[in-house]
């Protein structure tokens, strides 16, 4: 008798699914906030899934984590205090702590079970969460940002998709609170979904940020397991422009995706993406 195959499908739009073969269900839980699963896949290794959406995989996580962390941290000349909103898997913290000038990196995560599961089953990604420079705070990111003023050099919003607990992280009043939470020369980056499937969201977020921050930039990266593969990030900066940095300093850290030549290329947008944010 043939062995039964198990497949996982993420419904990425109402009309499109992303499907991969599962060799093992490592862990599942219903947390206070979401359904959590860690699956072993044939193609992408271990995969973290929240509410049916792929968050990260062992094979392609470096693409996302390097792009969301290093672009802002190399844009700011001296990022000593950094906060990550969301990102309970710990991948962004791992990348942040490659920067020696960072004195403290705070992980602000609403769902403690995501952190615990990542520490137990995804050590390759969560390995820096016990670093002495990292501090984990279990609270709502919106609440944390609105209660702290003039505190951080860089804030990274590593949110889930704009459903469930993350909805408020894509709204204008949140970006205003981020502005106030940053120091006078601070900057922030948020993941802002796919230019193929989320054009209205990208447009709205870009213009919300642009109305608050003097410098607003959109950049793109490739993450194979994310909807369409093409992914956007939006930066709001009070002072520093990512297009004007000395990219030679990027060589000092160990990366697999991001490099000096790529930095400026990330901001070269296809015409259809330029039109989204006009």
From Swiss-Prot:
One of its GO terms (biological process) is spermidine biosynthetic process. Spermidine binds at residues 65, 89, 158-161. S-methyl-5'-thioadenosine binds at residues 34, 109, 140-141, 165. Catalyzes the irreversible transfer of a propylamine group from the amino donor S-adenosylmethioninamine (decarboxy-AdoMet) to putrescine (1,4-diaminobutane) to yield spermidine. This is Polyamine aminopropyltransferase. Homodimer or homotetramer. It comes from Caldicellulosiruptor saccharolyticus (strain ATCC 43494 / DSM 8903 / Tp8T 6331). It is found in: Cytoplasm. It is an enzyme of class 2 (transferase). Residues 5-238 form the PABS domain. It catalyses: S-adenosyl 3-(methylsulfanyl)propylamine + putrescine = S-methyl-5'-thioadenosine + spermidine + H(+). One of its GO terms (cellular component) is cytosol. Keywords: Cytoplasm, Polyamine biosynthesis, Spermidine biosynthesis, Transferase. The lineage of its organism: Bacteria, Bacillati, Bacillota, Bacillota incertae sedis, Caldicellulosiruptorales.
